[in-house]
């Protein structure tokens, strides 16, 4: 069974396709719609099957045709982001203003913290203490890999 079919099968099997209170909805075709951000995510977080350098990932995303859409891109980051937990510089260090944990203005950070119940310093697959809706949202995605995910900006 292909990775895409496995993603869809897992979400369908569990019956976790979002509710009226959810920001995430199974869109079919290996896609998940985020109604809060008005963007569509790929359900398979490792669709390519290997890691890429940033420039290669940007080029891949901009040339991707998937689910009838050809306007894919890497997630956007917002800086400065005043929602970050560490929003003031520390003496003697580089200016880290608006960086840190629990940032919510960037697309991927919003997905991680708000929709999937991510916790600072923990893998997204660590689900202890997650609310039922966060568990349902996470079930919409598959093939999550430990490591780096690129932003487009």
Task: Please give the residue ranges for each predicted region.
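An exposed tryptophan-centered "aromatic clamp" motif
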Residues: 58-69, 77-153
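Short, compositionally biased
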Residues: 2-69, 87-88, 114, 119, ...
């Amino acid at each position: 069974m292909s990775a895409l079919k496995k993603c869809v099968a897992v979400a369908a099997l569990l019956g976790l396709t979002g509710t009226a209170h959810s920001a995430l909805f199974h869109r079919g075709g290996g896609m998940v719609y985020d109604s809060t951000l008005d963007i569509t995510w790929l359900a398979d977080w490792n669709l390519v099957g290997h890691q890429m350098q940033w420039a290669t990932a940007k080029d891949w995303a901009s040339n991707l045709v998937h689910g009838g859409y050809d306007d894919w891109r890497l997630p956007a980051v917002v800086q400065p982001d005043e929602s970050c937990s560490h929003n003031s510089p520390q003496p003697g260090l580089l200016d880290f203003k608006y960086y840190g944990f629990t940032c919510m203005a960037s697309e991927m950070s919003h997905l991680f913290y708000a929709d999937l119940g991510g916790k600072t310093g923990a893998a997204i697959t660590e689900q202890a203490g997650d609310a039922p809706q966060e568990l349902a949202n996470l079930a919409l995605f598959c093939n999550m890999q430990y490591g780096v995910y690129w932003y487009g900006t």
